[in-house]
């Protein structure tokens, strides 16, 4: 009897393996990944300096990893190194230029980890001859770490930091990055992208000056923003996806 059941067992086993392979093959075949880095500039928008949202003045960069879920959607993780600075001497409003003497200035360094989704306006296919470029929208959630003054009393009446007296500490907070960009294949698995990403924070002390400091003539009380604008070099690897049609 055992001899009679053996052929049936092997047939069922082969059938089960075949069904599992067919079921999971789209997942296995869709493993298209991207790694890359960006180089560009940052700028800050807050209580000090220029109020322009895109005006890079500090060299910055990031590294990232992406998983292309389909031709329109990708999941992205990014680490960014983002120095920022502001100086009322280069402000674009008379109020900020003239409010204090000497002019208020600051510098800070932000370390950021972000996770989000990239939405392509057109189908983007690294194996296609025609669908190899697209503008895109990026929405993320980020955790960022920066220097913050612990006590407002550490600032003197002109808004400058008394280096021998002030106390500061690193803070980690949440930001909401939103970006737009354009990407295109260069050659084979190599692509490039141009991107601007602006972050809204829920903090008002990236400039190490709190908006409610009574000794300073602060204009407005909105939270701070920081922006990165740059160019990316991207390498695509992994198995060709199930949607990769060469057309």
What residues fall within each predicted segment?
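Predominantly the C-terminal beta-signal and adjacent terminal strand-loop region
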Residues: 187-247
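Residues that define the transmembrane beta-barrel architecture of outer-membrane proteins
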Residues: 31, 55-59, 109-113, 133, ...
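Residues on the lipid-exposed face of transmembrane beta-strands in outer-membrane beta-barrel proteins
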Residues: 37-39, 63-67, 77, 115-119, ...
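Extracellular loop and loop/strand-boundary signature of outer-membrane beta-barrel proteins
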Residues: 45-51, 99-106, 161-168, 216-221
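Gram-negative (and chloroplast) outer-membrane scaffold detector with strong preference
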Residues: 71-155, 232-237
């Amino acid at each position: 009897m055992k001899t009679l059941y053996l052929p049936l067992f092997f047939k069922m086993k082969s059938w089960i393996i075949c069904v599992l392979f067919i079921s999971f093959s789209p997942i296995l075949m869709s493993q298209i990944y991207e790694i890359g880095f960006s180089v560009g500039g940052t700028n800050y928008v807050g209580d000090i300096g220029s109020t322009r949202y895109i005006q890079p003045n500090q060299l910055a960069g990031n590294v990232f990893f992406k998983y292309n879920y389909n031709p329109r959607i990708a999941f992205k993780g990014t680490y960014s190194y983002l120095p920022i600075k502001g100086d009322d001497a280069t402000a674009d409003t008379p109020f900020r230029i003239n409010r204090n003497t000497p002019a208020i200035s600051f510098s800070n360094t932000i370390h950021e980890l972000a996770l989000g989704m990239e939405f392509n306006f057109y189908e983007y296919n690294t194996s296609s001859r025609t669908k190899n470029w697209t503008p895109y929208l990026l929405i993320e959630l980020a955790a960022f770490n920066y220097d913050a003054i612990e006590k407002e009393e550490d600032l003197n009446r002109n808004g400058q930091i008394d280096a021998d007296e002030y106390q500061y500490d690193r803070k980690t907070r949440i930001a909401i990055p939103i970006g737009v960009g354009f990407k295109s294949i260069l050659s084979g698995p190599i692509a490039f992208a141009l991107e601007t990403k602006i972050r809204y924070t829920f903090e008002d002390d990236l400039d190490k000056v709190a908006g409610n400091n009574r000794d300073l003539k602060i204009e407005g009380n909105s939270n701070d923003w920081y922006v990165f604008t740059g160019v990316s070099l991207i390498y695509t690897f992994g198995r060709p996806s199930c949607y990769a049609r060469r057309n």
